[in-house]
Amino acid sequence: MAALRALCRLRGAAAQVLRPGAGVRLPIQPSRGARQWQPDVEWAEQYGGAVMYPTKETAHWKPPPWNDVDPPKDTLVSNLTLNFGPQHPAAHGVLRLVMELSGEMVRKCDPHIGLLHRGTEKLIEYKTYLQALPYFDRLDYVSMMCNEQAYSLAVEKLLNIQPPPRAQWIRVLFGEITRLLNHIMAVTTHALDIGAMTPFFWMFEEREKMFEFYERVSGARMHAAYVRPGGVHQDLPLGLMDDIYEFSKNFSLRIDELEEMLTNNRIWRNRTVDIGIVTAEDALNYGFSGVMLRGSGIQWDLRKTQPYDVYDQVEFDVPIGSRGDCYDRYLCRVEEMRQSIRIISQCLNKMPPGEIKVDDAKVSPPKRAEMKTSMESLIHHFKLYTEGYQVPPGATYTAIEAPKGEFGVYLVSDGSSRPYRCKIKAPGFAHLAGLDKMSKGHMLADVVAIIGTQDIVFGEVDR
């Protein structure tokens, strides 16, 4: 800058400069009489900054020190935000997770739900009590008859009726078959997500046999609409109880094969032990139920504590975990399958003869044979299936021990043939709320294992 100032003081051709590398002073010769422009002090100050066209913002910029002594400024490192699902095969339906990752460590896990919302609770308000029943098959579409059982018990409580003993035993029988269906799906797809393919193929063969039992008793493989207010739709066909007995006799061997594949498998233990730990306190605070609660060491099973139908007449044990991790919950589900086999065999041995519907013509439709001969029965059938039956005003909360946890139905009647309000309490909703707590600090791959152990189905979460 000092050299520029000295240069600007010189005028005209008398200005002389030193050519680099030579000691000879040469006069500056203006070309064709034109005066040669030289940068002055103002120009150098204006354009000598950080940018070519400075502004107020750039005026405050200071050049960094050109050495390695001064430490660089601390910079903020932001975590990676990742979308998991909803099209991911391990998302078990339409789960979308917005995860915050630090490297491969999960810092935050935010579930976004509602992608399978169908407005079930509102639709039920526009249907009769019988027409509302099939909606429950489509909530937790892996354990269909358990959902029907909860709704039927709620309607029966409002009607103040009790189904005959045979109907109650059939309900318990198929409730435990449904529990087997659900736990096979839960355990094998959990293993499939982690990378064990064999149990999935082995156990789904058994699952197919149980779907055949569904089909023989109701005509449908999945959405049965078999358990109805007042009893069940129709009696067991001939030979079905023998086939269920043969199935249950051999099914414990299939469970042994499943445990042989997984229980002491080194890779399975590495992927599940100490993953997704839930303490007993957290399980209660989050409102967990079912295996998610029992895996943490709390022995709570509505079939024992608040028995419904004929669960007070069957003997079974309630398995609980000790650590509250994925491995304990897996062991609980496997043991529950063994206990379900015990209950099924007791149901087959204690199945009484008799009616399968309540003896109340205002609730139960007449038999097909009567409709063919009696005009009054035909009219009665028509009125029941078009207008439905009136339910006395009242409200009830009825809960059962569904395979995933406590499935509750809060039913309000205003005295008409349609429910005034039907609120459904799904166990998977509370479990999904605890996903952030369970997955924090784990690796990204462990989130898949945690979703699998929660046994989430989005039909009931989104409703």
UniProtKB/Swiss-Prot annotation:
Catalysed reactions listed for this entry: a ubiquinone + NADH + 5 H(+)(in) = a ubiquinol + NAD(+) + 4 H(+)(out)
GO terms under cellular component: mitochondrial inner membrane; mitochondrion; respiratory chain complex I
Localization per record: Mitochondrion inner membrane
Modified residues annotated as Symmetric dimethylarginine in this record: 118
Record PTM: Dimethylation at Arg-118 by NDUFAF7 takes place after NDUFS2 assembles into the complex I, leading to stabilize the early intermediate complex.
Record's subunit section: Core subunit of respiratory chain NADH dehydrogenase (Complex I) which is composed of 45 different subunits. Component of the iron-sulfur (IP) fragment of the enzyme. Interacts with NDUFAF3. Interacts with NDUFAF7. Interacts with CERS2.
Cofactor note: Binds 1 [4Fe-4S] cluster.
UniProt topology in membrane: Peripheral membrane protein
Cofactor requirements of the protein: [4Fe-4S] cluster
Record InterPro entries: NADH_Q_OxRdtase_suD, NADH_UbQ_OxRdtase_49kDa_CS, NDH1_su_D/H, NiFe-Hase_large
Molecular function GO terms recorded: 4 iron, 4 sulfur cluster binding; metal ion binding; NAD binding; NADH dehydrogenase (ubiquinone) activity; oxygen sensor activity; quinone binding
PANTHER family, per the entry: NADH DEHYDROGENASE [UBIQUINONE] IRON-SULFUR PROTEIN 2, MITOCHONDRIAL, NADH-UBIQUINONE OXIDOREDUCTASE 49 KDA SUBUNIT
One Gene Ontology biological process: mitochondrial respiratory chain complex I assembly
The entry's keywords: 4Fe-4S, Acetylation, Electron transport, Iron, Iron-sulfur, Membrane, Metal-binding, Methylation, Mitochondrion, Mitochondrion inner membrane, NAD, Oxidoreductase, Respiratory chain, Transit peptide, Translocase, Transport, Ubiquinone
NCBIfam families (UniProt xref): NuoD (TIGR01962), PRK06075.1 (NF004739)
Entry keyword Mitochondrion: yes
Domain of life: Eukaryota
Function description: Core subunit of the mitochondrial membrane respiratory chain NADH dehydrogenase (Complex I) which catalyzes electron transfer from NADH through the respiratory chain, using ubiquinone as an electron acceptor. Essential for the catalytic activity and assembly of complex I. Redox-sensitive, critical component of the oxygen-sensing pathway in the pulmonary vasculature which plays a key role in acute pulmonary oxygen-sensing and hypoxic pulmonary vasoconstriction. Plays an important role in carotid body sensing of hypoxia.
Record: residues binding [4Fe-4S] cluster: 326, 332, 347
N6-acetyllysine modifications at: 62
Keyword Mitochondrion carried by entry: yes
Transit peptide: 1-33
Predominant place of localization: mitochondrion
Protein's name according to its UniProt entry: NADH dehydrogenase [ubiquinone] iron-sulfur protein 2, mitochondrial
